[in-house]
């Protein structure tokens, strides 16, 4: 801490990280959403395909499933099949599935439209996922309460966001 206090790391399973280029595993579309869990782990957690469809609706990718004969069981080379924005939206559906207490989002919506991005961030707020976002997009400031800005010369400042967020760069 800069001026005092105690820094603690959340317990395993309470923190989730999504990079700008999310990992796509070999396997079904379902496997992409529940990664690194298996289908058996998904069932043990009490999750169903209906839950996955809910997450796909939030990230506006239900059509991706409907376009495939085998639906969630479709197996493709997802790293090549999905666009950059679709991969980022699958990663957000993955976040919703795992439902951690905290999430670090590292430019993870850079290829997603502002309206879909807003829906995803709003859902995180609704379900109580605390977000730490690394981004240059001005559109994201409205989804946060604080900014920790680095100046590129070793300095930083902690800012409470009040009202509009136009002052925080693009």
Explain the meaning of each model-derived region.
Residues 1-54, 118-128:
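Conserved post-Walker A segment of ABC ATPase nucleotide-binding domains
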Residues 18, 29, 56, 92-93, ...:
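Hydrophobic, well-ordered secondary-structure elements that form the walls
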Residues 136-166:
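H-loop (His-switch) and adjacent beta-strand-loop-beta switch element
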């Amino acid at each position: 801490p800069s001026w005092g206090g105690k820094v603690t790391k959340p317990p395993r399973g309470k923190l989730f990280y999504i990079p700008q280029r999310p990992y796509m595993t070999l396997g079904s579309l379902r496997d992409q959403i529940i990664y690194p869990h298996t289908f058996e782990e998904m069932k043990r957690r009490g999750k169903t395909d209906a839950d996955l469809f809910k997450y796909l609706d939030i990230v506006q990718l239900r059509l991706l499933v409907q376009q495939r004969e085998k639906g969630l069981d479709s197996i493709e080379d997802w790293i090549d099949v999905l666009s950059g924005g679709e991969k980022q939206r699958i990663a957000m559906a993955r976040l919703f599935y795992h439902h951690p207490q905290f999430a670090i989002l590292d430019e993870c919506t850079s290829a997603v439209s502002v309206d879909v991005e807003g829906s995803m961030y709003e859902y995180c707020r609704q379900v109580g996922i605390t977000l730490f976002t690394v981004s240059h997009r001005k559109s994201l400031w409205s989804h946060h309460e604080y900014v920790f800005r680095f100046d590129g010369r070793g300095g930083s400042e902690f800012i409470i966001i009040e009202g509009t967020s136009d002052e925080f760069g693009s």
